[in-house]
């Protein structure tokens, strides 16, 4: 297996121009495909997840052009639901941001489509979404294991009263919200359980509004969506920088700054993960906010005990930053780490112990006490881009770290390690 050893980093300083947000990129691509008119997306993320979405749109007959660096996409909308001529199988890798929204959107027309993916995708639950779509009339069959992909979709979604469990993944609600306006009837979506990752729903609603569709949000408990609507292209749309990707550079600055400035997001960003900067500030770093940047300057870091449900992806970065904080850090209400690219609670606990931390792994929390001195370790990444990026922070100690399968960052940030090196000074 390929590996990358990072030597100790004495200091970080500089500016990082963030790649486009994964969450925004794939939502914008799907809405542009469903919309009337031509949409030009700029600062699109070039990553595995986005390529899976683009490949699916190609197979569904959409036409688009990509710039050489794959960050500018002109796409001609279908002006309504996507339709496949004849039976079709779409392979979506491990891209949850493609699998969940497409599973819903492709139930609008009389299609016969199979959605499948990598082995890990077949372990990521989708039953709550399928149950909700079936309530709205969709005809969906599990081809292997009940409640998991692969799925066979045969249309039938017409709207109506739909319940969805919000406690595992906000992507199920996102998928329903983006699909419902194109259904022939009105849809009332009721949320069962506590809605996780609420800021990701705000991204969805924000993008739908950009494409001309507004819905009634009743305190995140119920959503009322008028049927028979259509999406309209906004013309040109700039994809925000990825706030989850910003977390690694901001944390590096908190630990070994200097000052690091990330551009492409700022105080008005629609992504909930910008709130990661508030957590660093609470730990002791200095944060400065601009309209299109956030900067972080080193501070003496202290442990925190916090509910991280609102920023589950960026919260992983706090778990490795905790290695540099004084005291024991507890991150709570993060059960949905277990249904991501890997079981992130198990993976994080396992790898933190390798570098010497004392770790308590609960059902939905993790407690981390740093060692006096970090151990050198080979970090397994579990084919999870965020594990690779989080554990790069270990090099901010006086100990090197080896990251196994470093190219797994291609899911959201193909040149992550080059960007980190650019702002790093060797010890």
Swiss-Prot record:
Q: What does this protein do?
A: Catalyzes the transfer of the enolpyruvyl moiety of phosphoenolpyruvate (PEP) to the 5-hydroxyl of shikimate-3-phosphate (S3P) to produce enolpyruvyl shikimate-3-phosphate and inorganic phosphate.
- According to its UniProt record, which residues of this chain constitute the active site? 313 (proton acceptor)
Q: Does the keyword Ubl conjugation apply?
A: no
Q: Which residues bind phosphoenolpyruvate?
A: 22, 96, 124, 171, 344, 386, 411
At the top level of its lineage, which domain of life is listed?
A: Bacteria
- Its annotated pathway? Metabolic intermediate biosynthesis; chorismate biosynthesis; chorismate from D-erythrose 4-phosphate and phosphoenolpyruvate: step 6/7
Which Pfam family is one of those matched by this entry? EPSP_synthase
Q: Where in the cell is it found?
A: Cytoplasm
Q: What is the species listed in this Swiss-Prot or TrEMBL entry?
A: Shigella flexneri
Which EC class heads this enzyme's classification? transferase
KW Transferase (keyword) present: yes
Q: Which GO terms describe its cellular component?
A: cytoplasm
BP terms from Gene Ontology: amino acid biosynthetic process; aromatic amino acid family biosynthetic process; chorismate biosynthetic process
Protein name (record): 3-phosphoshikimate 1-carboxyvinyltransferase
Q: What gene, per UniProt, encodes this protein? A: aroA
Which key words tag this protein in UniProt? Amino-acid biosynthesis, Aromatic amino acid biosynthesis, Cytoplasm, Transferase
Q: Which GO terms describe its molecular function?
A: 3-phosphoshikimate 1-carboxyvinyltransferase activity
Q: EC no.?
A: 2.5.1.19
- What does the record note on quaternary structure? Monomer.
Catalyzed reactions: 3-phosphoshikimate + phosphoenolpyruvate = 5-O-(1-carboxyvinyl)-3-phosphoshikimate + phosphate
Q: Which InterPro entries match?
A: Enolpyruvate_Tfrase_dom, Enolpyruvate_Tfrase_sf, EPSP_synthase, EPSP_synthase_CS, RNA3'P_cycl/enolpyr_Trfase_a/b
Q: What is its main location?
A: cytoplasm
Q: Which family does it belong to?
A: Belongs to the EPSP synthase family.
Which residues make up the binding site for 3-phosphoshikimate? 22-23, 27, 169-171, 197, 313, 336, 340
């Amino acid at each position: 297996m390929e590996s990358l050893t990072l030597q100790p980093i004495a200091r970080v300083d500089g500016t990082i121009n963030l790649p486009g947000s994964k969450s925004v990129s794939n939502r914008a691509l799907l809405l542009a495909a469903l919309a009337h008119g031509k949409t030009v997306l700029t600062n699109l993320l070039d990553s595995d997840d986005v390529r899976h979405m683009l490949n699916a749109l190609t197979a569904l007959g959409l036409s688009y052009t990509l710039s050489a660096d794959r960050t500018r996409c002109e796409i001609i909308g279908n002006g309504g639901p996507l339709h496949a001529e004849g039976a079709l199988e779409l392979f979506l890798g491990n891209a949850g941001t493609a699998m969940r929204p497409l599973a819903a959107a492709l139930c609008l027309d009389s299609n016969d489509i199979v959605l499948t993916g990598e082995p890990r995708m077949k372990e990521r639950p989708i039953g709550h979404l399928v149950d909700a779509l079936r309530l709205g009339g969709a005809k969906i069959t599990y081809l292997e294991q009940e409640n998991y992909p692969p799925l066979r979709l045969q249309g039938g979604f017409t709207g109506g009263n739909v319940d969805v469990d919000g406690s595992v993944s906000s992507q199920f609600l996102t998928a329903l919200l983006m699909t419902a306006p194109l259904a022939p009837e009105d849809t009332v979506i009721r949320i069962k359980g506590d809605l996780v990752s609420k800021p990701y729903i705000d991204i969805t609603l924000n993008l739908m509004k950009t494409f001309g569709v507004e819905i009634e949000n009743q305190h995140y408990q119920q959503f009322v969506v008028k049927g028979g609507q259509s999406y309209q292209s906004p013309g040109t749309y700039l994809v925000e920088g990825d706030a989850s990707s910003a977390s690694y550079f901001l944390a590096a600055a908190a630990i070994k700054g200097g000052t690091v400035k990330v551009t492409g997001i700022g105080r008005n960003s629609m992504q909930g993960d910008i709130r990661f900067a508030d957590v660093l500030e609470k730990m002791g770093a200095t944060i400065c906010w601009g309209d299109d940047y956030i900067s972080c300057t080193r501070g003496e870091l202290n442990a925190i005990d916090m509910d991280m449900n609102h920023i589950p992806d960026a919260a992983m970065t706090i778990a490795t930053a905790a290695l540099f904080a004084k005291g024991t850090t507890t991150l709570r209400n993060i059960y949905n780490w277990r249904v991501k690219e890997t079981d992130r609670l198990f993976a994080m606990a396992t790898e933190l112990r390798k570098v010497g931390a004392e770790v308590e792994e609960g059902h939905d929390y993790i407690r981390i006490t740093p060692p006096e001195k970090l151990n050198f370790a080979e970090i397994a990444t579990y084919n999870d881009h965020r594990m690779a990026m989080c554990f790069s922070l270990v090099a901010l100690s006086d100990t090197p770290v080896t990251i196994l399968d470093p190219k797994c960052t291609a899911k959201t940030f193909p040149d992550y390690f080059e960007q980190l090196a650019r702002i790093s000074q060797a010890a």
